[in-house]
């Protein structure tokens, strides 16, 4: 009966002593079967002595209860520990001896209680553990892993600085029947939040012990620059993250404000043909910003100008020359080329499979002067000529209803319009008199208010 432990440092195969310690073997096998040990840390390493594991959270977690037996998982916290009888025949004489970590019972000091944690010896003849730990197995494969664990860097409490964890457990042979209520997971469960919170240095993180602080700082800056370049690529400021500035462009600064493009080109043209020379100016005022970009035809000419023109006096100003770090022109040309390519592809947004959404009610698109075809397309409505003539529905039911209207309806409408237009002259005269009387009363009221105001001022 054997169990394979897949750790972050390698595989360990354990043969179980079923006849000598049946209860401890059953507990260990069933805990492995329900994947209880997955992601459990090796939380204690004592060099040339033992290492201890089996608590899924480890002592660093405030939620840890020290582990539980399989019966505690199935029946509750009352059965979290179980009693073990230590066999006097089993001794810790060989390296790789596997035993359950035990504590004395509070009721009987001679009784030993165990849960899920177990110990693996890293040295021979450790008789100190006899009578304190219950042996139930031996390591038969993976002694190189034991050497790696023995040489791990640890803190003052014996905990590895870099995590050593059990990743998986595989049962090679199980002679025991499953207890009632035991559910075997279909796949290995993911680590819980409490387990992830105990990670110090991840077991898959690579560390270079020979790297000095300066090299590590340089590596950190390179990673940060790469991340920033990737961010600029994502927002569209760079055509791609690995873009480099052109090597045939010089950056010239500390220029005199009166220096012109032609003057600068004439001075630098002695090193070779110049494709462009531009003094950067303010867009609003046109004043020189006192720096320029000079693009040479050849890279060698650009390098020669860099070495020869550093600190040269131009128009009473000593200039500073450096290689251009700008990729703005590159980005602009890349954007223009990309946009033109997309426009030639057809479709919508440069994707031939896409089509602009048409918002319409009618399904047929043959009608030429359809006033209500587009629901929200205001641009189409503005471009469409306005027609004053009234349009009627093409539905046969509505057209027949319109034709079958009563002729009296139009007659009543015309009669009302004629009645409103032909008022009697007497009524119109009465309206005029009423308006005159209202205006006269308003004038009297205003005069009365003015007189009252004057009397108050006199008092």
From Swiss-Prot:
GO MF terms, alphabetically ordered: peptidyl-prolyl cis-trans isomerase activity; RNA binding
RRM domain residues: 248-326
Skewed-composition ranges (Basic residues): 407-416
Main location class: nucleus
Pfam families assigned: Pro_isomerase, RRM_1
Domain of life: Eukaryota
Keywords: Isomerase, Nucleus, RNA-binding, Rotamase
A GO-annotated cellular component: nucleus
Annotated region (Disordered), positions in chain: 376-459
Start-end of Basic and acidic residues biased regions: 377-392, 417-459
InterPro entries listed in its UniProt record: CRIP, Cyclophilin-like_dom_sf, Cyclophilin-type_PPIase_dom, Cyclophilin_PPIL4, Nucleotide-bd_a/b_plait_sf, RBD_domain_sf, RRM_dom
Transmembrane spans: none
Its job: PPIases accelerate the folding of proteins. It catalyzes the cis-trans isomerization of proline imidic peptide bonds in oligopeptides.
Family as reported in the entry's similarity comment: Belongs to the cyclophilin-type PPIase family. PPIL4 subfamily.
Protein name (record): Peptidyl-prolyl cis-trans isomerase-like 4
Organism of origin: Aspergillus fumigatus (strain ATCC MYA-4609 / CBS 101355 / FGSC A1100 / Af293)
């Amino acid at each position: 009966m054997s169990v394979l432990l897949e750790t972050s440092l390698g595989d360990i195969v354990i043969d179980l002593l079923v006849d000598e310690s049946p209860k401890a073997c059953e507990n260990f096998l069933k805990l492995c079967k329900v994947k209880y040990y997955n992601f459990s840390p090796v939380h204690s390493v004592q060099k040339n002595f033992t290492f201890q594991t089996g608590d899924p959270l480890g002592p660093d977690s405030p939620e840890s209860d020290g582990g539980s037996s399989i019966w505690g998982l199935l029946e509750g916290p009352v059965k979290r520990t179980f009693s073990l009888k230590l066999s006097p025949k089993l001794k810790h004489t060989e390296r790789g001896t596997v035993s359950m970590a035990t504590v004395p019972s509070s009721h009987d000091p001679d009784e030993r209680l165990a849960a899920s944690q177990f110990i693996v010896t890293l040295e021979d003849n450790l008789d100190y553990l006899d009578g304190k730990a219950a042996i139930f197995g031996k390591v038969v494969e993976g002694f190189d892993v034991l050497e790696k664990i023995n040489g791990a860097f640890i803190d003052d409490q014996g905990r590895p600085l870099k995590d050593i964890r059990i990743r998986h457990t595989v049962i090679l042979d199980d002679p025991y029947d499953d207890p009632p209520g035991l559910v075997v997971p279909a796949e290995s469960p993911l680590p819980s939040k409490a387990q992830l919170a105990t990670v110090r240095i991840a077991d898959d993180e690579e560390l270079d012990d020979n790297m000095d602080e300066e090299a590590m700082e340089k590596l950190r800056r390179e990673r940060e620059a790469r991340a920033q370049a990737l961010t600029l690529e994502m927002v569209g400021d760079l055509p791609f993250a690995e873009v480099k500035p052109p090597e045939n462009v010089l950056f010239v600064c500390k220029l005199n404000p009166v220096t012109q493009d032609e003057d600068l080109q004439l001075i630098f043209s002695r090193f070779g043909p110049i494709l462009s020379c531009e003094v950067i100016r303010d867009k609003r005022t046109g004043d020189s910003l006192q720096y320029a970009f000079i693009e040479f035809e050849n890279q060698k000419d650009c390098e020669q100008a860099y070495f020869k023109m550093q600190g040269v006096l131009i128009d009473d100003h000593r200039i500073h020359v450096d290689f251009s770090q700008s990729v703005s022109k590159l980005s602009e040309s890349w954007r223009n080329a990309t946009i033109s390519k997309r426009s030639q592809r057809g479709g919508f947004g440069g994707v031939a499979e896409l089509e602009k959404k048409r918002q319409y009610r009618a399904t047929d698109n043959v009608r030429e002067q359809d006033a209500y075809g587009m629901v929200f397309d205001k641009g189409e409505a503005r471009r469409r000529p306005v027609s004053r003539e009234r349009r009627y529905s093409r539905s046969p039911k509505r057209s027949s209803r319109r034709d079958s209207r009563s002729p009296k309806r139009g007659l009543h409408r015309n009669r009302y319009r004629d009645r409103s237009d032909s008022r009697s002259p007497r009524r119109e005269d009465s309206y005029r008199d009423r308006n005159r009387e209202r205006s006269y009363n308003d004038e009297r009221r205003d005069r009365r208010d003015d007189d009252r105001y004057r009397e108050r001022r006199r008092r």
